[in-house]
Amino acid sequence: MSWLRSSPLRQSGNGGGGGVSTGHSSTGSLRQRPIDAATDCDPRACYDSFCKHWQQAYDIIQHYAPPTHDDVLGVVSHLDYMVTLLLVELHHCNKVSLPSTDASAAPAAPCLEYLLSENLLDKLYEWACTTGRYANAVRLEQLKLYELLVSHSRHQLLCHEPFLRPLLKILASSQGEIFPPDLEKRLVILLNQLCVVLMQNVHLLDLFFFSAQTQVQEQIQNGNVPPPKSGTTTNFIIFSLLIPYVHREGSLGHQARDALLLCMALSQKNSNIGTYIAQYSSICPLLVTGLGGLYSRLPNSIEISSIDWHRITPDDVTEIPELTLFMNALEFCNAVVQVAHEMIKQQLLDFMYQGFIVPVLGPAVLQTLKGKHFQTNIDSQISAMSYLDLILRSITEPGLLRAFVKFLLDTEKFDGERILDSLVERLNSPDANLCMVTMALFDTLLGLHCEDLMLELLLKFMLPGKHVPISHRHKINKIDPYLNSSDFFLELSPDVLKRARDLARPKSVHEQQAPSGATGEQPIQPLAWPSLPSPVMSKTIGANWNYYGLHTGDSLYANLQAYLFEAHWRIAQCQRDCLKWANSYRYQKWPRHGQARVHAHALELARQFFSEFGGGPPAIASESAGEKQLDSLQSIGESSGYESFKWRPADEESDATDLTVTTTTASEADLEHNSSSVSSGMGGGGGAAAGRRGEVWRISHTNRNELLLTDLDFSEDLFAQGTVSLGPFLNAIWGKLQTFTSNSLYVNLHLTGLITRLAWYPLPLIHSLLLRSDIAITSDTPSFHQVLRILKQQIDAELPVTEDSLEIIDVARSSLIDREFRLVNARKGNENSPLHHHQQPQTTLSQQQQQQQGQQRSAYATLSAATPVQATQTSAYDPFKRSDNKRKSISKSISSMFSRRSTPNPPSSAASSGLSQIYAFFTGAASTLVGNNNNNSGSGGQSQPFSSTGTGTCETSLSTNPQSGAAAARSTGTATTANGNSSNSNISIGGSTQTLSGHSNTTTYSSSTLHGLDGGPQTGSFNSEPASLDSVASMGIIASTSGTERTRDVALCAVLLDEWLKELAAIAQEQSVVLVTDQLL
């Protein structure tokens, strides 16, 4: 314990802590302790010395005159010696020794026996009450003595009345008093130790709960202490003394909150304590009002220093003192709800909702004041939503999470306006920062796997099934289309990316023997899922593809095995959480036997429809099994659904399913299907979920009888196609997706991550929208697959398969991989600060020093000076080797732009052909760089880094929670957020350790700091590339290369879309595996 190490009682050469008073610290030198606690001494001599010191102190105590300064100093000095002797004795008593057979042997602790038998502590307390202005100094020494005895004797002394009675007296007299800081610290430490002892010995709890009441009444009768200010004699004195320190800063507040949590945990074991805290203490209102006050102190606008900032990270919390205090209070409330008695928990949740969430957090998110909207800027909206996102990511207790879910869906507290609807509207914001923060918040909400939230966002618009034509509804539970969907997503890859893969993939023996002319007439189609892994090469190091873990570089880019691993893990996690839902939203088969009334009702509805609109009943039985009678109405999808009116043959009946909502209760689902999953349509585990307090917030309590729908409302299905709405949430997401090529890179990263998170849900209804390309969608907006087709056509039109397009794609791909490495280096810098935190001075180094530092670079060094390489299949080149003079530039057209130099510049010649050219190519800085080369000759003949004139904007990680392989593999990734419970880790896939780029502790680095992480030289060359492409573009360099800004943006979108399609293909395949597994169980 830190307090014991720093205690003056353990230091033989120092005076007592605090002396008699703060004004007499110079007298501490008079109180030298000649022996240490661990010193071997004669027990008899120690006992004699102890009695002698007490006798001398008692002589001073017996003086009738008011104590003087010398009297108090003398008593304190003797008391200090007595404490030291007690330490020596307790040290020897705690040693393991054989029991003595001598009946006449002395007691094991004679000094302690004397202390208790003579009531020394009681006498000392009575004298301390008469010391007047020296009362605090004497009280401090008393607290030190009790602290020492409690820590060394554990619970044994608490059973002795000579020890317990004066302890209770001094605690009772401390109520309502204001003490100096040193005395407060000792008091909180003593209370903390008492809570630890009581937690380990619950049978002693009644001593402090009831004996305290008796002692207070006794002291009131004797006139020693005034009546307690609380107005009640029922008192848990330890808890009452800790309450004033609950919102204190620093170590004092932490120790007080730890002790209060122990008291809350004690309430679970003793119902009297729980009743007292809930009914007689003010802890719950105090916590909630303090939380609201701390929230009001938070900054109204957060300074955004990076271009891709989207949420508050733990580093941001530590850098903002007000936010640190607020998070400490919030985490304490979360812990109280977790460990406290049910009465305390419910009271705190009620106060939280009525006293903080609704009146404080609600207006802040809605930007309202007294019910009226006030003019605010974007920064205040961003900060309010960031705080809400941080709160949702920080709390873990189901009770609190359920309160926040209720807050998002409440329509009564905010004049009919729901918080969730306002958040959905902000998805359409033209401001990129607000849009990214909003999508990050929805990523957190979807990561909660809450049934009510999913019902309000998606499912209630999809449950009627109007978005799926009748003729396609029987396909929902089929398995094969999932595999076809994987091929569908891979085929949607832009043509220029397909061509790049064709050029990069080694040719087979058959292709090498084919004539050269046949190659151009019949291009090779890329394999969707290669049967055998093979190393794939391209003209740049950024195009080194990683199939199933076999890769030539350290990037996780295009690692299909990582995508499959990520999809499998995320789907399994989501499935486990959704198993606890009260209902399963699935397509349920019509029963084959029984329920003839249901069949008769369906046929009757069909006859009524045709008699009204068709003039007669349909000839259902007369049609042959192989014919399909089509309706004459205009069909928006593949069919109008007319053929679905007839009963399907037996071979189709097994797969034919119609949309209903399973309203089976949790207990029925648990009895009938114990091991089934949500993907197979079972709400299993409901009985366990009902008994698990920790998952109730995920379960919806909506009346499911209101959701019963009639699947055979044919007239509405046939005549309302094309007008079905998927809800404002999906409409906003689809709207952002339609402007994919116009969005910023970071908006697209969050957008793809949000859709990917939806695809993880094991719900066939969502799969019909996202993963099932064979199911037509009839809605008022283009379907997801239609939007993907439009994006492919748009990219193919703007990036035709030409040599220039392939070069731009290579540059875009390399830049995204370089971004991945920068994120990895930033994370490694956080985790391994001794190796990466030092920022080297930006001085000119000799060529030999540069080579030595280049050899010390880690495998995750940035790719700023790397150049394209012509690699064969057996090439074993190192993509991170910086001193390879055989490397070529990207192309002759690009190298020609940098070929004109007024003076030779050997140190920077290698650097001028790597990603520095890529950055220049992206930002159109060719002419500017050429012009600047002559101007930089004064600085050692090296050009100045971009970052010296650029902004301080740099990139941070897209996630505050750890991600699995594919999220880092895409680097361009999905902005996914895990449950807060996972930790940063490395996942070994395909025999290689893959460091994940998503992390929670993200530090923003400048360009020079990134190179300091790599251990590379800090020279004024192109090795000091800017932190991001956007920061280079922000310098205002006018584009002068062959590629326009629009072309470069489309190239980035094409590479991002290509990687995202691979991830969706992996998810579709893994979902099919889950569905097969569930059906076999």
Swiss-Prot record:
Region (Disordered): 1-31, 504-524, 650-685, 830-913, 933-1027
Phosphoserine PTM sites in chain numbering: S508, S833
Keyword annotations of the record: Phosphoprotein
InterPro entries membership: FHIP (IPR019384), FHIP_C (IPR045669), FHIP_KELAA_motif (IPR045668)
Compositionally biased residues, Low complexity: 657-668, 840-856, 891-913, 933-953, 964-993
The protein's name: FHIP family protein GA25918
Alphabetized Pfam families for the sequence: DUF5917, KELAA, RAI16-like
Family according to the record: Belongs to the FHIP family.
Protein species of origin: Drosophila pseudoobscura pseudoobscura
Domain of life: Eukaryota
Biased composition (Polar residues): 1-11, 857-876, 954-963, 994-1010
